[in-house]
Swiss-Prot record:
The protein's name in its UniProt record: Leucine-rich repeat-containing protein 20
InterPro entries reported for this sequence: Leu-rich_rpt (IPR001611), Leu-rich_rpt_typical-subtyp (IPR003591), LRR_dom_sf (IPR032675), LRR_domain-containing (IPR050216)
Pfam families linked: LRR_8 (PF13855)
LRR repeats: 51-72, 75-96, 98-120, 121-141, 145-167
PANTHER family attached to this UniProt entry: PTHR48051, RAS SUPPRESSOR PROTEIN 1
Keywords attached to this entry: Leucine-rich repeat, Phosphoprotein, Repeat
């Protein structure tokens, strides 16, 4: 067990160092068994955090993200958080004014993260396979850049299914009523 933990820590350190040394705009920490975003990474990336445009934290064990994460990486264009245990986003997600795409699929959201509706550049939202029942259709319809929202395999209420289509100017992907996600 300790050996596996040590390997995971070494893998994270290696990936962070690669990002810093190469001057990359991408930080890929997918499948690193993270339960939280490592605090030490903020210090290591302090001189390059503004040039990070894509972060992948997919398929970890994250239960939450801190406000510091959102404000430190305020220049993000893409954020991949799929396959975690997230159920909410911090209000500081509003700092991500340049964010174009966010993937929150396969998490534990029961409520639609309404803070996303305030992001002016956001084009794509993926919330597939969560537990969302209601969606702020009017707020989504007012988003200037939104092109696509994926809500497949969420137990959406009938009202959303009826009200949304005539109000929206973007693609809204929904499963047939009562459909459940396929087993992995």
């Amino acid at each position: 067990m300790l050996k596996k933990m040590g390997e995971a820590v070494a893998r994270v350190a290696r990936k962070v160092n690669e990002t810093v040394e190469s001057g990359s705009d991408t930080l890929d920490l997918a499948e690193c068994k993270l339960v939280s975003f490592p605090i030490g990474i903020y210090k290591v990336l302090r001189n390059v955090s503004g040039q990070i445009h894509l972060i992948t934290l997919a398929n970890n064990e994250l239960k939450s993200l801190t406000s510091k994460f959102m404000t430190t990486f305020s220049q993000l264009r893409e954020l991949h958080l799929e396959g975690n245990f997230l159920h909410r986003l911090p209000s500081e997600v509003s700092a991500l004014q340049h964010l174009k795409a966010i993937d929150l699929s396969r998490n534990q959201f029961q409520d639609f993260p309404e803070q996303l509706t305030a992001l002016p550049a956001l084009e794509t939202i993926n919330l597939e396979e969560n537990e969302i029942v209601d969606v702020p259709v009017e707020k989504l319809a007012a988003m200037p850049a939104l092109r696509s929202i994926n809500l497949r395999f969420n137990p959406l209420n009938a009202e959303v299914r009826v009200i949304a289509p005539p109000l929206i100017k973007f693609d809204m992907l929904m499963s047939p009523e009562g459909a459940r996600a396929p087993l992995p």
